[in-house]
Amino acid sequence: MHAIMLKAKLHRAEVTHAVLDYEGSCAIDGDWLDLSGIREYEQIQIYNVDNGERFTTYAIRAENGSKMISVNGAAAHKAKVGDRVIICAYAHYGEAELASHKPRMLYMAPGNQLSHTSEAIPIQVA
């Protein structure tokens, strides 16, 4: 059995740039790519918390320490500067990998400050 699982997530990052006339992609602070395990040119899903848009693009590296999230190309129609987004990467895992799989999640505070990291989402209670 194989399953598609969450590999990495940047939770509630703020869009810092939306550049329509740029080759399509999403530039992400290189430190965050390294910490999350998201690779350059890897497919990512972006969920816009502020307007409900959901779209697919690929990650490119922004300058380390820049705190940049730049939504580029046609995707710039889906997010504006200041929007809060969730950026996710998914991967296929075999049955042997599933038992030990833990996603890498980065949680952002206002101003794209890294709040904390986690490998699990708390159980939701009523």
Swiss-Prot record:
Enzyme Commission number(s): 4.1.1.11
Annotated metabolic or biological route of this protein: Cofactor biosynthesis; (R)-pantothenate biosynthesis; beta-alanine from L-aspartate: step 1/1
Pyruvic acid (Ser) sites (modified residues): 25
Posttranslational modification: Is synthesized initially as an inactive proenzyme, which is activated by self-cleavage at a specific serine bond to produce a beta-subunit with a hydroxyl group at its C-terminus and an alpha-subunit with a pyruvoyl group at its N-terminus.
Classification via SUPFAM superfamilies: ADC-like
Top enzyme class: lyase
The protein's name: Aspartate 1-decarboxylase
Organism: Pseudomonas paraeruginosa (strain DSM 24068 / PA7)
Gene that specifies this protein: panD
